[in-house]
Amino acid sequence: MAADANNLIWIDLEMTGLEPDVDRVIEIATLVTDQELNIIGQGPVIAIHQSDDVLAAMDDWNQKHHGESGLIDRVRASQMNEAQAVAQTIAFLEQYVPKGASPMCGNSVGQDRRFLNRYMRELEDYFHYRNLDVSTVKELVKRWSPETMAGFKKQNTHQALQDIQESIAELQYYRSKVFKI
C-alpha cells in the first residue's frame, strides 16, 4: 500500500502517571485510518520495559488500573525499550502515511505529545504539528448538545489499543450525530 497524506495516525500511550518529568511511557499502540475513519492498519502494541523502581513509584490509581489490566506484568516481562518501540512504530507508519502529514489523533493527545516530546522525539516528529483531539469534540458536545452524550459509552480499559479503537468509534459517533457533513 502506498503512503497517503490523507490517512490519519491514531495513537495512545499508557504512562506511569501524568508528569513527563517523572513518569514514563509503559505502552504504545497505533492505528491508521483513511480520511473516512475506516481502520486500514494496526501497528504494533508494545509494552515498554521500565524498572521496578519506576513501576513502584506509580500512584494508587495507576497501580490499580495497570495491575488489573495485566499491563504491569507485561511491562516487567518486556525486553522492548523506548527506542525500539519508536523504530517499530515508525516502520509501521511509513507504510501508510508520509512523515509530517497526519495530525496526532486520539483522546487527550496533548498529553501523549508531551511524553513523546520528552522520551520519543523521533516519533513525535513523525506527526504534523496539529492535533485531532476527540476529547475537544466531546467537551463541545457535552456543552452544546448534552443529550447526544448519552448515546456513546466508553469502556475505559486503559489499554492502548482498545482506547484508540474507542476514540475512533467515538469520533464516528459524533460525526453521525453532530456533524452534518
Swiss-Prot record:
Localization per record: Cytoplasm
Keyword list, A-Z: Cytoplasm, Exonuclease, Hydrolase, Nuclease
One BP term from GO: DNA metabolic process
Enzyme Commission number, as recorded: 3.1.15.-
GO CC annotation: cytoplasm
The protein's enzyme class: hydrolase
CDD domains: Orn (cd06135)
Name of a matching Pfam family: RNase_T
All copies of domain Exonuclease, residue ranges: 8-171
GO terms of molecular function: 3'-5'-RNA exonuclease activity; nucleic acid binding
HAMAP family, A to Z: Oligoribonuclease
Protein's job: 3'-to-5' exoribonuclease specific for small oligoribonucleotides.
Protein's UniProt name: Oligoribonuclease
Encoding gene per record: orn
